[in-house]
Regions:
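Basic, helix-initiating cap at the start of DNA-binding domains
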Residues: 1-6, 53
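Terminal helix-turn-helix DNA-binding modules in bacterial transcription factors
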Residues: 9-26, 45-81
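A generic structural signal for ordered secondary structure
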Residues: 27-31
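Core residues of bacterial helix-turn-helix
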Residues: 32, 81-82
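Short coil turns linking two alpha-helices in DNA-binding domains
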Residues: 35-38, 84
Length: 84
């Protein structure tokens, strides 16, 4: 199980570093050295969320934090995190 968690951790680090950009499951799964299909199954089992769900949740969380802590316009923050 430790190997799987490290593989998922590597992928999560990549996702966190690229949240403001475009993320593709092929590239994310490559970071875990797994096929996209198998990666999604393991990710869902270990994290309790699908990959797309996790990415949406993290982007919304970061956008909410930015809106609360800055004077940025909603439209600008939305565009920054891919909600256009």
């Amino acid at each position: 199980m430790e190997d799987w968690t490290q593989a998922i951790q590597n992928a999560l680090e990549y996702v966190e570093e690229h949240l403001a950009g475009e993320l593709e499951i092929c590239e994310i799964s490559r970071r875990a050295f797994l096929s996209p299909f198998y990666f999604q199954r393991i990710f869902s089992t270990l994290c309790g969320l699908g990959v797309g769900e996790y990415i949406r949740y993290r982007r919304l969380t970061l956008a909410a934090q930015e809106l609360c802590s800055t004077d940025a316009k909603v439209i600008d923050v939305a565009a920054k995190y891919g909600y256009n």
